[in-house]
Design a protein with these regions (language model features):
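Acidic, metal-coordinating catalytic segment for phosphate/diphosphate chemistry
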Residues: 1-26, 31
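A generic fold-level signal
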Residues: 19-21, 29, 99-102, 126-128, ...
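Conserved hydrophobic "DFG−1" position in protein kinase catalytic cores
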Residues: 28, 36, 108-109
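Structural motif
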Residues: 33-34, 43
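Short loop/turn segments immediately following the C-termini of beta-strands
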Residues: 39
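Nudix hydrolase/Nudix homology domain
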Residues: 44, 115-176
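A short gly/proline-enriched turn/hairpin at secondary-structure junctions
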Residues: 45-49
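Unchanged
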Residues: 51-79, 84-145
Length: 176
């Protein structure tokens, strides 16, 4: 899988311990709108999340999209797009003093028409996470506005840059 982007804050010492997280995220279009997760502040992100030990990328993608959105991925539609790599000093207290190194693997896929219940974590519920559908341009504008208003939070910058890469891919004739 091709690396699409490296976001390296370079705010850490090279000799620090490293916490590596593998995430898998889905790029799903429904009637020309992108399937996203939106919080109560209006921030949007691709559905997906951390890979459990022993899980394949496909298994993680299927599980995470079902949990986040209630939709079921059609397995034979899964197509790799690339990955985003992030490195920065970990800001979570239980990993403080470590390098946070995340690799987000991105896949295009399709979902079935029927939608079930979401299975959000308590933290996701507290943030008011819900399923949303926006055009790609609307999603880019929402995250650009968040960057302008809130500043460059790590995941928001990742999501914004990812959406721009998806747009560039589609405009250059790539499959969505």
């Amino acid at each position: 899988m091709e690396r699409l982007l490296l976001l390296d804050a370079k705010d850490y010492d090279e000799d620090m311990d490293e916490f590596v997280r593998i995430a898998v995220r889905g790029i799903v279009f429904i009637s020309n709108r992108l399937l996203l997760i939106e919080d109560n502040k209006g921030e949007v992100k691709l559905p997906g999340g951390g890979q459990d030990e022993g899980e394949s990328d496909s298994d993680t993608l299927i599980r995470e999209i079902r949990e986040d959105t209630g939709y079921s991925v059609i397995p034979d539609t899964i197509r790799p797009f690339g990955y985003i790599e992030e490195k920065r000093r970990d800001f979570k207290s239980y990993h403080e003093g470590r390098i946070f190194h995340q690799i987000s693997r991105l896949y295009f896929c399709e979902v079935s028409d029927e939608r079930g219940e979401t299975q959000l974590s308590e933290q996701e519920k507290q943030y008011g996470m819900r399923t949303a559908l926006y055009t790609l341009d609307e999603a880019i504008a929402k995250n650009r506005a968040m960057l302008d208003n809130v500043g460059e939070l790590a995941w928001n910058q990742r999501e914004y840059r990812t959406l721009l890469l998806i747009k560039e891919h589609i405009e250059n004739g790539g499959v969505s």
